[in-house]
């Protein structure tokens, strides 16, 4: 390219478009928290045509069968207030029915089936990055921005998903199911920040009312962390008692419902006084049994996966083996593994070092063993 040609090429704005920010419309998914509020404020100050959208997803009162217990309304109020403070339009969309069908119902049914689900991933996959993204397109937005801590980088071939600069805030585990088409349209302006302190400093700089708002800790529709109560409200009879047995089938005690237990759990089993500490190693919801065993029984080397979302440059099935790193829990670091495809949507992962407490219903996320790129992931299941 000659210097004359280069001078005629429009410079890309901060969102990657060859036009001024004022001509670039961006829908910001606003939860009412500090992260998405900062994204909206920063983009508005840069001169972008910002449209804030908040989804009404749940009502704590409905989830817990308590009148007047809705906290979602406060988040909507906070998002609307930030939009007013920064001077851009804000809309609230009622997605409660969609959220219940796509996320909450599966959450309850997964526990009934003896799995340990991750509803935040399903929400991103089936609601925020599906229906909300389509709404952004309907609003003729050039892209949609969120407050997630993850990075979108342009690689040699296409947009790539990379871990956040702040490893403590990285949300890549919860975003593995982002498709390539969605990634092309999405932007994550906070992914490069070194710490949450920087986000709060930006909120304070803009004078946002949510600058000191605490981070949410619980699943949004389980505000007090008591997921079993929510499941029993949604699926009456879900807490049927049954037997706690060892790996040989010997009855050791009784439990208060399979939904109260997860793989790897040790506390709260009510079978103390034994010489060897025992952990939940398997759940059998059909027989209403909780199977316990020694810690070594939790070690898993082979992990069956389905519903794989692949973000690699070559097709997943183009190779018999892929050397990768994987996370089988959001709180654990990536571990070296070998990915063996069965089809474009199913595979087996061999962990080079066994992991404890690998549970059906959790995600297994694929990482570049030598870098920050995310290659997608899949859902752990019991296998055929």
UniProtKB/Swiss-Prot annotation:
Location in or out of the cell: Cytoplasm
Record-linked SUPFAM superfamilies: Adenine nucleotide alpha hydrolases-like
CDD domains reported for this sequence: MnmA_TRMU-like
Record key words, sorted: ATP-binding, Cytoplasm, Disulfide bond, Nucleotide-binding, RNA-binding, Transferase, tRNA processing, tRNA-binding
GO molecular function: ATP binding; tRNA binding; tRNA-uridine 2-sulfurtransferase activity
Region entry Interaction with tRNA, spans: 169-171
One Pfam family per UniProt: tRNA_Me_trans_M
Record EC number: 2.8.1.13
Similarity annotation: Belongs to the MnmA/TRMU family.
HAMAP family named among the record's database cross-references: tRNA_thiouridyl_MnmA
Protein name (database record): tRNA-specific 2-thiouridylase MnmA
The species this protein was found in: Dinoroseobacter shibae (strain DSM 16493 / NCIMB 14021 / DFL 12)
Gene name, Swiss-Prot/TrEMBL: mnmA
């Amino acid at each position: 390219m000659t210097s004359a040609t280069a001078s005629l090429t429009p410079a890309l704005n901060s969102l990657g478009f060859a036009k001024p920010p004022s001509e670039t419309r961006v829908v910001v998914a606003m939860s009412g928290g500090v992260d998405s509020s900062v994204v909206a404020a920063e983009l508005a100050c840069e001169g972008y045509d910002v449209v804030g959208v908040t989804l009404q997803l749940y009502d704590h009162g409905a989830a817990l069968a308590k009148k007047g217990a809705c906290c979602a309304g406060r988040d909507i109020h906070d998002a609307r207030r930030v939009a007013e403070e920064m001077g851009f339009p804000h809309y609230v969309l009622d997605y409660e029915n969609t959220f219940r069908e796509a996320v909450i119902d599966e959450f309850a049914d997964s526990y009934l089936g003896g799995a340990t689900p991750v509803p935040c991933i399903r929400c991103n996959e089936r609601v925020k990055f599906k229906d909300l993204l389509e709404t952004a397109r309907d609003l003729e937005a050039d892209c949609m921005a969120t407050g997630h801590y993850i990075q979108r980088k342009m690689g040699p071939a296409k947009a790539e998903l990379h871990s956040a600069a702040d490893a403590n805030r990285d949300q890549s585990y919860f975003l593995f199911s982002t498709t390539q088409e969605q990634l092309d349209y999405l932007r994550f302006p906070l992914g490069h920040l070194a710490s949450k302190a920087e986000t709060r400093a930006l909120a304070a700089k803009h004078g946002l009312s949510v600058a000191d708002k605490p981070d949410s800790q619980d699943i949004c529709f389980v505000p007090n962390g008591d997921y079993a109560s929510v499941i029993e409200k949604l699926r009456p009879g879900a807490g049927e008692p049954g037997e706690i047995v060892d790996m040989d089938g010997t009855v050791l005690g009784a439990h208060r419902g399979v939904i109260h237990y997860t793989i790897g759990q040790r506390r709260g089993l009510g079978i103390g006084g034994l010489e060897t500490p025992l952990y939940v190693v398997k759940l059998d919801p059909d027989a209403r049994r909780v199977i316990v065993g020694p810690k070594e029984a939790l070690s898993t080397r082979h992990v069956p996966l389905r519903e794989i979302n692949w973000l690699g440059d070559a097709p997943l099935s183009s190779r018999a083996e892929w050397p990768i790193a994987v996370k089988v829990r959001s709180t654990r670091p990536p571990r070296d593994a070998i990915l063996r495809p069965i089809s474009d949507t199913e595979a087996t992962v061999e962990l080079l070092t066994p992991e404890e407490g690998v549970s059906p219903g959790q995600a297994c996320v694929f990482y570049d063993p030598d870098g920050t790129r995310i290659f997608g992931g899949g859902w752990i299941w019991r296998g055929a």
